[in-house]
């Protein structure tokens, strides 16, 4: 395997790193105190000689009452001041963890969430003109009405892995290097990098993701497993040249716990990356990085976020999407060809899709804000990745593993619109469960899910925990089933992800043969659509959403170390092209006209978010 290593400029000086020793003190597994100023705003003052992110400090703030939200508080100390007992205990604990072999150790602070929202926190970390800076915001709405307990966000990954047709680029922003390799299976690259670390389970943090890899794996990622059967050379036209895989390693993450009304700012210390692998040096750098993260969340000038007025009817028909990669006649013809393959016994089912395009001057982040209103879903995603921005409201999990090493697959198939009343919902649920076509399609997908889970699970542990239950979402209801298994001892989350891609709900059955036919029928590559987007945490937890109901906004080049700019032109409004891809599951008795209309309706639901963004933000 040929490797070329080229030195490049570090990422941003602020993050590479605005982390000098002597910055804010933090505590391993124990949170720090927070000061509130006269306006009631949470503040953490940096020590003398440092600033929020760089350069000399401002004059010290007036002291106000100190509110401790933990049993122990830490105070900033200058080098000339003797270490306090609490600081000595923290250093000893950190050193003990390092001596036990842990080389990835988390520090964190927690603050009240009453003056901070996930949207505002994201804008504090990522400025309006930094649309190409890799970053993410993950939120959740359960049952269409209940906010999920956690929201996650982060920016400035320390490392990125980007793959395109076997060419893998590893960008190390901390060291300022770029390594290019040829890989037969790029999914293994992030896994191999992760093997360097023995992470320490954070004390006091909620049981959730708090740092690790975040990004997407596109539909075409599966080709690496079946290069002979699904070669890139026979794939549809690659008109956007987006990466097959794009992952960022985030050691600085902000976690909102909506149940306890707290925000956790987390930094993971890489002990081995410290000079000489020294634990004390790693702790000092970690304290500085954590301090910079906390300070970034409470800037002197709060970012301006237009309120956005919701004056349009959210149930009104959205603007029509007419620009597609397939005309209606072409789609109907492709459905007919698919049914011929089914009757010939080649396949049982195939998911046929096409891609719509919509131009708008609404900023992608404004579209995400509108999407949260229009279509709240279990997986609300705003992801700035290499070459594109993903704006998603996916209802469906691709795969999940937890710290107990349980593998979860939850196919969704079979859909009805929500009723206006509870009685209508109940009647629609009964109608959905009585639909033989919907049940047959769902049964095939459950079988595919059992097979995917079985490939990575211990014998005898694969179970269908729930079968054909109706789940309600904000605008629709779906038939859902849940398949679980116990992960084999020698496998990890990356193996689970490899086995799950792509989901049967976006490919068909049998999976590989269906994908071969999709290559023949569809006009362009799917890109992120039909793949997975989510996270793999340091502790092995993984949650990947299926990239459905996902808007893809092409941005720029995908192969450069990101650069941030204050150029006024980048702050001005520009025209964006938003891609919305949707598909329909074709079976033997499918009606071509109905299947086409299903794809149009699915895409239109996302177009409503663009309509709202344009109206609410006066675009």
Q: Which positions does each model-derived feature cover?
A:
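N-terminal chloroplast transit peptides
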Residues: 1-53
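Intrinsically disordered, low-complexity polyampholyte segments enriched for Lys and acidic residues
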Residues: 27, 37, 41, 62, ...
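Intrinsically disordered, low-complexity regulatory regions enriched in Ser/Pro/Gly/Thr
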Residues: 1, 7-9, 22, 62, ...
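N-terminal mitochondrial targeting presequences
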Residues: 2-5, 17-19, 61, 65-83
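Intrinsic-disorder/low-complexity peptide segments enriched for small residues
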Residues: 13-15, 22, 51, 64-67, ...
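Extended alpha-helical targeting/anchoring segments
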Residues: 74-619
């Amino acid at each position: 395997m040929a490797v070329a290593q080229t030195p490049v400029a570090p990422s941003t000086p602020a993050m590479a790193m605005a982390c000098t020793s002597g910055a804010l003190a933090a505590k391993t597994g124990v949170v720090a105190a927070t000061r509130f100023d006269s306006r009631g705003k949470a503040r953490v003052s940096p020590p003398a000689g440092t600033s929020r992110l760089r350069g000399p400090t401002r004059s010290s703030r007036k002291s106000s009452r100190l509110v401790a939200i933990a049993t122990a508080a830490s105070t900033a100390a200058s080098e000339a001041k003797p270490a306090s007992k609490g600081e000595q205990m923290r250093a000893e604990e950190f050193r003990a963890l390092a001596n036990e072999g842990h080389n990835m150790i988390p520090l964190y602070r927690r603050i009240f969430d009453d003056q901070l929202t996930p949207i505002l926190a994201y804008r504090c970390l990522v400025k309006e003109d930094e649309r190409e800076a890799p970053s993410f915001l993950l939120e959740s709405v359960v049952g269409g009405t209940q906010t999920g307990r956690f929201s996650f966000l982060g920016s400035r990954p320390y490392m990125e892995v980007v793959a395109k047709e076997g060419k893998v680029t590893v960008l190390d922003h901390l060291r300022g290097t770029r390594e290019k390799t040829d890989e037969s299976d790029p999914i293994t690259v992030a896994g191999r990098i992760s093997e360097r670390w023995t992470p320490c389970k954070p004390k006091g943090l909620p049981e959730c993701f708090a740092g690790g890899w975040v990004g997407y794996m596109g539909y075409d990622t599966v080709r690496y497993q079946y290069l002979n059967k699904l070669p890139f050379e026979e794939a549809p036209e690659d008109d956007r040249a987006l990466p097959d895989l794009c992952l960022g390693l985030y050691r600085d993450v902000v976690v909102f716990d909506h149940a306890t009304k707290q925000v956790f700012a987390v930094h993971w210390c890489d002990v081995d990356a410290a000079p000489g692998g020294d634990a004390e040096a790693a702790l000092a750098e970690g304290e500085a990085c954590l301090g910079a993260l906390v300070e970034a969340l409470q800037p002197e000038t709060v970012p301006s976020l237009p309120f956005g007025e919701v004056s349009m009817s959210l149930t009104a028909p959205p603007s029509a999407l007419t620009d597609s990669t397939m005309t209606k006649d072409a789609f109907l013809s492709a459905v007919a060809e698919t049914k011929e393959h089914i009757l010939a016994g080649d396949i049982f089912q195939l998911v046929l899709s096409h891609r719509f395009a919509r131009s708008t001057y609404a900023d992608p982040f404004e579209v995400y804000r509108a999407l949260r209103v229009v279509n709240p879903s279990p997986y609300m995603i705003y992801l700035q990745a290499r070459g594109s921005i993903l704006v998603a409201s996916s209802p469906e999990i691709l795969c999940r593993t937890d710290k107990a090493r349980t593998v979860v697959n939850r196919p969704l198939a079979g859909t009805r619109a929500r009723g206006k009343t509870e009685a209508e919902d109940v009647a629609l649920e009964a109608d959905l469960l009585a639909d033989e076509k919907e049940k047959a399609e769902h049964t095939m997908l459950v079988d595919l899910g059992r097979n995917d889970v079985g490939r990575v699970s211990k014998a005898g542990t694969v179970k269908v925990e729930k079968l054909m239950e109706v789940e309600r979402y904000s605008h629709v209801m779906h038939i859902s089933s849940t398949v679980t298994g116990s992960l084999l001892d020698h496998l990890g989350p990356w193996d689970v992800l490899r086995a799950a891609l792509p989901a049967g709900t976006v490919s068909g059955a049998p999976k590989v043969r269906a994908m071969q036919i999709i290559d023949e029928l569809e006009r362009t590559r799917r890109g992120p659509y039909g793949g997975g987007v989510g996270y793999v945490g340091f502790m092995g937890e993984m949650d990947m959403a299926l990239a459905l109901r996902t808007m893809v906004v092409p941005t720029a080049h995908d192969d450069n170390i990101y650069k941030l700019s204050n150029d006024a032109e980048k702050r001005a409004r520009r025209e964006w092209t938003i891609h919305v891809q949707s598909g329909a599951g074709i079976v033997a008795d499918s009606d071509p006209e109905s299947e086409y209309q299903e794809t149009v309706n699915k895409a239109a639901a996302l177009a409503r978010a663009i309509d709202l963004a344009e109206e609410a933000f006066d675009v």
